[in-house]
Amino acid sequence: VVLDVLLNRTAHVNESAAVLKAASDDIQEFISASAITDIYYIAQKELKKTSLTKQLIRNLLQIVHVSSVSEVDIWAALDSGWEDFEDAVQNSVAEHHRFDCIITRNTSDYSNSALSVMTPQEFVNKFVSK
């Protein structure tokens, strides 16, 4: 979702941008510290401009809060039985911090999550387009 916006992925940018724009006092949005490094790596690889990539991350941090990834989260991910470790870590962080939902375009990756998992469009329809 974040990469859709930062990299202006035209097929998904509008719905993903609406998710980020929804951040407010009523809706707090979080991203894990490990996801920030992944986003930086992917954006830098595509943009090939360190200063631009850093500025995009700075802009992102004005919108979302960063959640730590603890040893407990890593152990929970390892013990989760999930095939994709990165997704398991994200889910463990979200559960540990008692987040209400996970927003992703790849909802099937989180089919084993105890949390509500929704696409950007589902989130916008439920919480923004009232």
Residue ranges, per PLM feature:
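Short beta-strand segments at enzyme active-site cores
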Residues: S32-A33, T104
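Short, well-structured N-terminal submotif of metal-dependent ribonuclease cores
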Residues: V1-I31, K45-L52, N112, Q121-K130
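General small-molecule cofactor/ligand-binding pocket signal
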Residues: F30, S67, M118
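Acidic, PIN/NYN-like endoribonuclease modules and their adjacent C-terminal/linker elements
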Residues: I63, E95-K130
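Active-site-proximal, substrate-binding regions of enzyme catalytic domains
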Residues: T10-V13, A17, S34-I74
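Short, active-site-adjacent cap segments at secondary-structure transitions
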Residues: L3, T37-I39, D109-S111
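Structured helix-beta-strand junction loops
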Residues: D25-D26, I63, S80, S113
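Active-site neighborhoods of divalent-metal-dependent phosphate/nucleic-acid chemistry enzymes
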Residues: H65-T107
